[in-house]
């Protein structure tokens, strides 16, 4: 069988930013609420206005969710272009505080990678 070995963890460094956590930071209300927020606040026209060909484009934005849920260091990881990364960054920065990540039962500061898909319809 498999064994679980508990390794004692030293006190979590106050300013450490986790990349892997047991419980990911999430938008308040979960994925459904996040989808609703994006539909209301993301300008989906940015891609077509920017001249993107019809199709589906996914941009990935990385940011830090602090222990109090505030968002910082919002940066695009992709370079699809047509203004999509800038629009995704704007929408995330303007949103509410997130529910912070947890590690070993403690609220921690953690990175979050968030894909956002833009769809450009055929005219």
What is the role of each PLM region?
Residues 1-123:
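Charge-biased low-complexity segments
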């Amino acid at each position: 069988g498999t064994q679980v070995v508990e390794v004692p963890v030293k006190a979590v460094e106050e300013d450490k930013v986790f990349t892997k956590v047991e419980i990911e930071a999430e938008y308040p209300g979960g994925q459904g609420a996040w989808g609703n927020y994006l539909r209301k606040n993301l300008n989906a026209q940015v891609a077509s206005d920017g001249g993107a060909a019809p199709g589906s484009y996914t941009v990935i934005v990385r940011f830090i969710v602090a222990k109090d849920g505030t968002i910082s260091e919002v940066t695009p990881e992709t370079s699809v272009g047509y203004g999509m990364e800038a629009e995704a960054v704007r929408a995330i920065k303007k949103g509410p505080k997130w529910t912070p990540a947890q590690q070993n039962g403690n609220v921690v500061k953690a990175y979050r990678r968030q894909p956002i898909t833009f769809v450009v319809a055929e005219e």
